[in-house]
């Protein structure tokens, strides 16, 4: 396929965005859970 050259770039971008977004959501979720447990 001809899209093989541009595909890894999109994959790296996609992994970078989700790699930052997923832990952020999990981090916020854990913080809110800790606050609920303390109260």
Curated annotation (Swiss-Prot):
Residues noted as binding heme in the record, renumbered to the chain: 18
Cysteines joined through disulfide linkages: none
Cofactor note: With its partner (PsbE) binds heme. PSII binds additional chlorophylls, carotenoids and specific lipids.
Bilayer topology term: Single-pass membrane protein
Annotated localization: Plastid, Chloroplast thylakoid membrane
Subunit structure: Heterodimer of an alpha subunit and a beta subunit. PSII is composed of 1 copy each of membrane proteins PsbA, PsbB, PsbC, PsbD, PsbE, PsbF, PsbH, PsbI, PsbJ, PsbK, PsbL, PsbM, PsbT, PsbX, PsbY, PsbZ, Psb30/Ycf12, at least 3 peripheral proteins of the oxygen-evolving complex and a large number of cofactors. It forms dimeric complexes.
Record family assignment: Belongs to the PsbE/PsbF family.
Official protein name in the record: Cytochrome b559 subunit beta
């Amino acid at each position: 396929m001809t899209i093989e050259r541009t595909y890894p770039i999109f994959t790296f971008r996609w992994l970078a965005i989700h790699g930052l977004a997923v832990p952020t959501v999990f981090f916020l979720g854990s913080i809110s859970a800790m606050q609920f447990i303390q109260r």
